[in-house]
């Protein structure tokens, strides 16, 4: 009751009707096994929230807790879209041409070639509906552009992506292509994708800090130059700030589900809610389901 009042005290009376508080008595900690915790802690906040989404008492869910628990709750509580064997987390990363979608960025560390194809289809729908990119280009993350490069997973995935008629597959891409914007959608397994995501975030933060240090330690002319480029620096910092993108979409489950960093501040949560609204209003789940059906029919005909 006290927490409920604290939340509502931050809003005026006109806004109070927009807020409904649902109580839960349990929480899933970061060090717990996600699957076991979701099954045993029926009153955990993420489990309660997922039930509300399943029962259509809300249109989308935003979580900034344990990623593993969020994925497990979505799988057990919502279920997968028919034809999707492995949901994927789709994360937008800034590039020279706009935004590149990377998936999977951490839903599951391993993936079969068939799962990668499903990710490519889901990522294409995301890029087309959420980012308004027509006929998005899809690339398979690899150690070289040649079709013969890569490990067993990459070698087995390439021909499947090449044969998939419902995506615009352009071939293998390397890590540097993500920020160059060579393609719009980059497909990889969750282990590699999560490493890429964390590296990109760390690199962006390091670059901004190094630039600030260079200006502060560079003498009068450097400081003068820093003042002149301050507006541009602010714009760059905003573009590289993960909080501006809100959260990542968990694609492949039956309702809009957004996953944020556990360290997300107010701005990130606000933007994640905006992403969730777009996710629901653009019927991304329904479009993914439709494209998966088309893909399966095409493969059956072949």
Please provide the spans of the model-predicted regions.
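Short glycine/serine/threonine-rich phosphate/pyrophosphate-binding segments
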Residues: 42-56, 60-74, 85-90, 112-113, ...
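Phosphate/nucleotide-donor binding subsite
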Residues: 15-58
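Short, small-residue-biased leader/transition segments that mark boundaries at the very start
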Residues: 2-7
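A short helix-to-beta-strand connector/capping loop
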Residues: 14-20, 165-167, 253-254
């Amino acid at each position: 009751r006290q927490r409920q009042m604290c939340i509502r005290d931050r809003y005026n009376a006109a806004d109070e009707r927009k807020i409904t508080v649902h109580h839960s008595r349990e929480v899933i900690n970061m060090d717990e096994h996600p699957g076991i915790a979701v099954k045993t802690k029926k009153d955990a906040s993420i489990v309660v929230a997922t039930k509300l989404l399943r029962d259509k008492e809300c249109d989308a869910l935003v979580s900034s807790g344990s990623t593993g628990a969020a994925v497990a709750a979505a799988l057990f509580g919502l279920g997968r879209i028919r034809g999707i064997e492995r949901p994927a987390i789709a994360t937008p990363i800034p590039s020279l041409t706009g935004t590149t979608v990377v998936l999977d960025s951490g839903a599951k560390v391993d993936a079969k070639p068939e799962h990668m194809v499903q990710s490519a289809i889901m990522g294409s729908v995301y890029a087309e509906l959420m980012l308004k990119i027509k006929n998005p280009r899809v690339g398979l993350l690899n150690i070289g552009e040649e079709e013969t490069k890569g490990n067993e997973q990459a070698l087995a995935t390439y021909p499947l992506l090449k044969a998939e008629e419902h995506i615009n597959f352009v071939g293998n891409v390397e890590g540097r292509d993500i920020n160059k914007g060579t393609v719009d959608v980059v497909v990889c397994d969750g282990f590699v994708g999560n490493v890429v995501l964390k590296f990109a975030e760390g690199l962006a933060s390091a670059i901004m800090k190094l630039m600030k240090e260079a200006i502060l330690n560079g003498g009068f002319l450097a400081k003068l130059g820093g003042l002149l480029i301050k507006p541009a620096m602010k714009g760059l910092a905003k573009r590289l700030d993960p909080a501006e993108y809100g959260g990542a979409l968990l694609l492949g489950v039956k309702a809009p589900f957004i996953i944020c960093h556990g360290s997300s501040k107010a701005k990130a949560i606000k933007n994640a809610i905006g992403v969730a609204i777009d996710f629901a209003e653009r019927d991304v789940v329904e479009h993914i389901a439709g494209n998966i059906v088309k893909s399966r029919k095409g493969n059956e005909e072949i």
